[in-house]
């Protein structure tokens, strides 16, 4: 399995913090934001990772992560021009992925809890075409929201609805196979001009989507309140001895 980290976008919800920098460089407790999704992929046993960059401070992102050796990873990079959506960014990785299953993690997602190695293996060896992790939140209107049937199965996803049909959202961890790239090519831009990940996931419904609930703690860090929440969660994990120290990176 290979990995993707999406680290583009304009991050207007974090202005003025992100006027002159990429949000994924902002600190969350004792390390840059982007270290968290990198650690999520490393915890699955993934070693080959592509970072999709865009927006400001691309050079600084590359300088920070370098070739990934200090994470035990082999990192490569691809540039996304403009805010064209998560599904569009995934489509840029077609040549990198080749014939392998892959996991895409959004660069502003912080997962603190058990690693995902077992879930990654279950997807890779299972029958599903795609997968994501569900998580219950208090403000689902900020996200894509899962609609469930009476048996608790996901039947649809809706992007940032005004009236959410549940409090369960697909967090920014997506398991996919190479066949996803053909589906990405069939998507049409949403009203905000993006290829939406919820539209891609809906192509696998009903019945072809792996969608377990995440049992750890999760937050995105795309707004000032959620950035603060992420730091608080990381501090709690650190004080409990559950947050490993950030990897040491040689400074030249």
Where are these regions (language model features)?
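Ligand/cofactor pocket segment of small-molecule handling proteins
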Residues: 138, 142, 147, 151-153, ...
């Amino acid at each position: 399995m290979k990995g993707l980290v999406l680290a583009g976008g304009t991050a207007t919800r974090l202005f003025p913090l992100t006027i002159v920098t990429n949000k994924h460089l902002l600190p969350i407790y004792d390390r840059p934001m982007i270290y968290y999704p990198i650690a999520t992929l490393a915890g699955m046993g993934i070693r080959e990772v592509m970072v999709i960059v865009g927006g400001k401070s691309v050079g600084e992102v590359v300088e920070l992560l370098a070739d990934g050796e200090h994470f035990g990873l082999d990192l490569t990079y691809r540039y996304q021009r403009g805010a064209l959506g998560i599904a569009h960014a995934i489509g840029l990785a077609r040549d990198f992925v080749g014939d392998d299953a892959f996991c895409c993690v959004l660069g502003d997602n912080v997962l603190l809890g058990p690693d995902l190695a077992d879930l990654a293996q279950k997807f890779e060896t299972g029958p599903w075409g795609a997968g994501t992790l569900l998580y219950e939140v208090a403000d689902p209107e900020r996200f894509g929201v899962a609609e469930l049937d009476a048996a608790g199965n996901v039947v649809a996803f809706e992007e940032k609805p005004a009236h959410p049909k549940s409090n369960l959202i697909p967090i920014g961890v997506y398991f996919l196979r190479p066949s996803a790239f053909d589906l990405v090519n069939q998507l049409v831009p949403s009203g905000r001009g993006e290829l939406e990940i919820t539209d891609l996931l809906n192509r696998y419904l009903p019945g072809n989507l792996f969608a377990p609930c995440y049992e750890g703690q999760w937050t995105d860090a795309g707004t000032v309140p959620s950035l603060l929440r992420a730091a608080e969660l990381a501090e709690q994990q650190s004080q409990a001895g559950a947050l490993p120290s950030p990897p040491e990176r040689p400074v030249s």
